[in-house]
Amino acid sequence: MFGKLSLNSIPYHDPIIMITCCVVILVFLVISIIITIAQKWQYLWNEWCCTVDHKKIAKMYIFLAFIMLFRGFADAIMMRMQQFLVSSYHGNGTGFLPPHHYDQIFTAHGVIMIFFVAMPLVIGLMNFVVPLQIGSRDVAFPFLNNLSLWLTIFSALLMNVSLGIGEFAQTGWLAYPPLSELQYSPGVGVDYWIWSLQISGIGTTLTAINFLVTIIKMRSSGMNWFKIPVFTWTSFCTNILIIASFPVLTVSLLLLTLDRYLGFHFFTNDFGGNMMMYVNLIWIWGHPEVYILILPVFGIFSEVVATFSSKELFGYTSLIWATIVITILSFIVWLHHFFTMGASANVNAFFGITTMIISIPTGVKIFNWLFTMYRGNVRINSIMLWTIGFLITFSIGGMAGVLLSLPVIDFSLHNSLFLVAHFHNVIIGGVVFGCFAGITYWFPKLFGFMLSEKWGKRAFWCWFFGFFCAFMPLYALGLMGMTRRLSQNINPQFHSMLTIAALGTILIFIGIVFQIIQIFVSIRDRNLNRDCSGDPWNGRTLEWSTTSPPPFYNFAVLPIVQFRDSFWESKKSFKSNKLPILYTSFHMPKNTKFGFLIGFFAFLLGFSAVWYIFWLFFISFFVIIYLLVIKSLDTNCDYIISIEEIKEIEKCINIKKMD
C-alpha cells in the first residue's frame, strides 16, 4: 500500500539528520501554537494563501528564498568544515560527515541555492516591481501567479522532506547519468530530485508566460518599448529565456524519469542509451539559467545607479541592445561546460569563441554603469555598497570565465575548484549582491519603512570580505590541482587555503546574522523610518509615484507616460506628484484557493511517485485535473471597485501620509 515507504526510510542512525529534523518540527509546532493563540489561521488562509495580489506574492517568494538560504548555507558550512577537518595534519582524518551524507549535502546545496534561493529572489522582485514600473494594477493572469508560487513552495517542501524521510540525490545538482540511473542510484534520492525540479520548473514556466503577457499587453498609455525601465526590459528578456529553456529541462527530467521508472534507455550505458545527450540537454537549459538569474540583477543595478547618481542612465539604448544580444548568445555557448567531452577541435573552438563574445555586451553594461556614476552626485549608502561590491566581484568572476572559455585551459581546470570559485564569483557577487541591493532599494515601497543603514553596511562588509576569503583561495586550490566535491583523503598541503576559505564562510555567516538583526531593528524602529512620501530615494520610475506600500490596486488612476523617466521628468517640471482626482471604476481579481490546492496535490503526486505509492499518485493526478477544470469554468473571478470606494481608500491613504 505504501510502496517503498517504511519506518526504515527514516534515518534513525544519523544523529545530525535526526537533530535537524527535531529542531525543524519543534520550530513548526511553536509557530503553529503562536498562530493558533493569535487566532490568525483564517487570516493567513484568506489574505496570504489565497491571495492573487502580486505584491503579497512577491513577499512570499522572497520569504521562501531567505528560509531556503538558511538551509543552503548550513549545507555550505558543513562542507567547508568537513574539508577543513579532513585536510588537517592533526585533525580528524575522516571528518564528521560520511561520504554518502556529504554527497547529499553538496547536491542539495546546489539545488537549493539555484532553484529555491536565487530563482525565488529574482521572481519575487519581478513580481513586485514590474507591474508598478509599467503602470499596471496587476499581472495579466493573477491566478497563474498564485499557482506558480505554490508550485514553487511545495516543490521546496518536497525536497526538504527528503531530509527526514529517505535521502536526497548523491549525484551533484545536475544529476548526470549514468550515476543518476537506477543501476547506480537505486534509492529514492534521485527521484526526490526529479520531482522537486519538475514541479518547480512548471511553476517557473507559468511565471514566464504570465510576465511576458503582462509586459507586452499591460503597459501604461504612451510607454513604448524604448520608454520601458531597464529592470522591466531585463525581466522581459529573462522570461523569454525561461520559456525557451525550461521546457528543455522538463523534457530532460521526463526522459530520465522514463529511464528510472519504466526501464527506458535514453541515457543508460547500454541498449543504445547516450548519457552525453543528457549532458547536452541539461546544459542547453543550464547556461541560459545563469542569465535568467543575472539579467534581472543587471536591471536592478541600472535602476540603482541612475537613482543614486542623480543622473539619467548613460547609454540606455546600448544597455537594451546588450541585454538582447546576451539573451540570444546565451543559447549558443552551452558546450563550454564540457569541452572535455570529446567533441572536435572545431566544435570546441566555436563554443569557446561564442563564450568570449558574450562577455562583450556584459562589459558594455559595466561601462554604462561606471559612466553613469562619473561626475554624478553619487550618494553612498548600503545599496550603492552592494553595487560597488558587485562591480568588483563580478568583474573578477567574468575574467575567470573568459579564461575558462579557452579549451586548452579548460582541459586543465575542468572539474577543479577553479571552476567552483568562478561560478560562485558570478552567482554570489552578481545575483546575491544584486538581489540584496534590490531588496534594500525597494524595501520601503514593499513595506512602508526603510531598512537600518547601520546594520546594512555592517552586513555588506561581512559579505564582501567573507566572499573574498571564502572563494579566492579556491582559485589557487584549483590551480594546485584540487578537484571539486572531495570529502575524504584531501592533500594536507591544501589545508591552509581551506582554513582561509572556512574563515570566509564564517564571515559570511556573521553577515547573515547582521541582516537578521537589520530586519528586527528596522521593524522595531519602523515608525522612525517610515516612508511617508512614497519616494524616499528621489527615484525616476513609476513605482515611486505611488504610496509606500501601494494600495492593493497600485494606481487609482493609471499613469500616462510621456518620457523615459516619466516620474523624474514630472518632478523636474514642478508638477504635483499626486495623481489627478478623476477616478473611474475598475475590475480587480478575486482571491482563489485553487493555486494552493493544486500545489498541495502536486506535492502529494511527487511524494507518491518518489515512493511508488501509485494509488496516491493517480488520485493526486486526477484531483489536479479536476481542480484545473473547475477553475477554468469559474467565471466569477473578479469584482468591481467603485468610484466611492476608491475615494474612501485614497482619503485614508492621504490621512496616513499626514500622520
UniProtKB/Swiss-Prot annotation:
<dbReference type="GO" id="GO:0016682">
    <property type="term" value="F:oxidoreductase activity, acting on diphenols and related substances as donors, oxygen as acceptor"/>
</dbReference>
<feature type="transmembrane region" description="Helical">
    <location>
        <begin position="110"/>
        <end position="130"/>
    </location>
</feature>
<keyword id="KW-0813">Transport</keyword>
<dbReference type="GO" id="GO:0009060">
    <property type="term" value="P:aerobic respiration"/>
</dbReference>
<feature type="transmembrane region" description="Helical">
    <location>
        <begin position="460"/>
        <end position="480"/>
    </location>
</feature>
<feature type="transmembrane region" description="Helical">
    <location>
        <begin position="236"/>
        <end position="256"/>
    </location>
</feature>
<feature type="topological domain" description="Extracellular">
    <location>
        <begin position="404"/>
        <end position="416"/>
    </location>
</feature>
<feature type="binding site">
    <location>
        <position position="71"/>
    </location>
    <ligand>
        <name>a ubiquinone</name>
    </ligand>
</feature>
<keyword id="KW-0186">Copper</keyword>
<feature type="transmembrane region" description="Helical">
    <location>
        <begin position="610"/>
        <end position="630"/>
    </location>
</feature>
<feature type="transmembrane region" description="Helical">
    <location>
        <begin position="417"/>
        <end position="437"/>
    </location>
</feature>
<feature type="transmembrane region" description="Helical">
    <location>
        <begin position="149"/>
        <end position="169"/>
    </location>
</feature>
<feature type="binding site">
    <location>
        <position position="336"/>
    </location>
    <ligand>
        <name>Cu(2+)</name>
    </ligand>
</feature>
<dbReference type="GO" id="GO:0020037">
    <property type="term" value="F:heme binding"/>
</dbReference>
<dbReference type="GO" id="GO:0046872">
    <property type="term" value="F:metal ion binding"/>
</dbReference>
<feature type="transmembrane region" description="Helical">
    <location>
        <begin position="193"/>
        <end position="213"/>
    </location>
</feature>
<feature type="topological domain" description="Cytoplasmic">
    <location>
        <begin position="372"/>
        <end position="382"/>
    </location>
</feature>
<dbReference type="GO" id="GO:0015990">
    <property type="term" value="P:electron transport coupled proton transport"/>
</dbReference>
<feature type="binding site">
    <location>
        <position position="101"/>
    </location>
    <ligand>
        <name>a ubiquinone</name>
    </ligand>
</feature>
<feature type="transmembrane region" description="Helical">
    <location>
        <begin position="15"/>
        <end position="35"/>
    </location>
</feature>
<feature type="binding site">
    <location>
        <position position="75"/>
    </location>
    <ligand>
        <name>a ubiquinone</name>
    </ligand>
</feature>
<keyword id="KW-0249">Electron transport</keyword>
<feature type="topological domain" description="Extracellular">
    <location>
        <begin position="481"/>
        <end position="499"/>
    </location>
</feature>
<dbReference type="InterPro" id="IPR014207">
    <property type="entry name" value="Cyt_c_ubiqinol_oxidase_su1"/>
</dbReference>
<feature type="binding site">
    <location>
        <position position="291"/>
    </location>
    <ligand>
        <name>Fe(II)-heme o</name>
    </ligand>
</feature>
<dbReference type="InterPro" id="IPR036927">
    <property type="entry name" value="Cyt_c_oxase-like_su1_sf"/>
</dbReference>
<keyword id="KW-0812">Transmembrane</keyword>
<feature type="binding site" description="axial binding residue">
    <location>
        <position position="422"/>
    </location>
    <ligand>
        <name>Fe(II)-heme o</name>
    </ligand>
</feature>
<feature type="topological domain" description="Cytoplasmic">
    <location>
        <begin position="631"/>
        <end position="659"/>
    </location>
</feature>
<keyword id="KW-1133">Transmembrane helix</keyword>
<feature type="transmembrane region" description="Helical">
    <location>
        <begin position="351"/>
        <end position="371"/>
    </location>
</feature>
<keyword id="KW-0406">Ion transport</keyword>
<dbReference type="GO" id="GO:0005886">
    <property type="term" value="C:plasma membrane"/>
</dbReference>
<keyword id="KW-1003">Cell membrane</keyword>
<feature type="binding site">
    <location>
        <position position="337"/>
    </location>
    <ligand>
        <name>Cu(2+)</name>
    </ligand>
</feature>
<feature type="transmembrane region" description="Helical">
    <location>
        <begin position="500"/>
        <end position="520"/>
    </location>
</feature>
<feature type="topological domain" description="Extracellular">
    <location>
        <begin position="257"/>
        <end position="280"/>
    </location>
</feature>
<feature type="topological domain" description="Cytoplasmic">
    <location>
        <begin position="302"/>
        <end position="318"/>
    </location>
</feature>
<feature type="binding site">
    <location>
        <position position="484"/>
    </location>
    <ligand>
        <name>heme b</name>
    </ligand>
</feature>
<protein>
    <recommendedName>
        <fullName>Cytochrome bo(3) ubiquinol oxidase subunit 1</fullName>
        <ecNumber>7.1.1.3</ecNumber>
    </recommendedName>
</protein>
<feature type="transmembrane region" description="Helical">
    <location>
        <begin position="281"/>
        <end position="301"/>
    </location>
</feature>
<feature type="topological domain" description="Cytoplasmic">
    <location>
        <begin position="438"/>
        <end position="459"/>
    </location>
</feature>
